Amino acid sequence: MTTLFQLSVFALIILSFLLVIGVPVVLASPDGWSTRKNTVFSGASLWIGLVFLVGILNSFIS
């Protein structure tokens, strides 16, 4: 259970880093938002899911 928690936290950190770098690049590029809108929304949805997963797993670890 601890390993699953650690992997989910690691995935959350990596995804957060990718979104912090990627979203401004997509918004700054010409015609980037209209072509990459689904990718940004998918990344944001995955991030929200990981936040809830980390919270749920944390309740089992603590």
Curated annotation (Swiss-Prot):
Gene Ontology biological-process entries: photosynthesis; photosystem II stabilization
Keyword Ribonucleoprotein included in the entry's annotation: no
Localisation: Plastid, Chloroplast thylakoid membrane
Membrane topology: Multi-pass membrane protein
InterPro entries assigned to the protein according to its UniProt record, in alphabetical order: PSII_PsbZ, PSII_PsbZ_sf
UniProt main location, coarse: plastid
Gene Ontology, cellular component aspect: chloroplast thylakoid membrane; photosystem II reaction center
Transmembrane segments: 8-28, 41-61
Subunit structure: PSII is composed of 1 copy each of membrane proteins PsbA, PsbB, PsbC, PsbD, PsbE, PsbF, PsbH, PsbI, PsbJ, PsbK, PsbL, PsbM, PsbT, PsbY, PsbZ, Psb30/Ycf12, at least 3 peripheral proteins of the oxygen-evolving complex and a large number of cofactors. It forms dimeric complexes.
Protein's job: May control the interaction of photosystem II (PSII) cores with the light-harvesting antenna, regulates electron flow through the 2 photosystem reaction centers. PSII is a light-driven water plastoquinone oxidoreductase, using light energy to abstract electrons from H(2)O, generating a proton gradient subsequently used for ATP formation.
NCBIfam families: PS_II_psbZ (TIGR03043)
Family the entry assigns: Belongs to the PsbZ family.
Protein name, as recorded: Photosystem II reaction center protein Z
High-level lineage: Eukaryota, Viridiplantae, Streptophyta, Zygnematophyceae, Zygnematophycidae
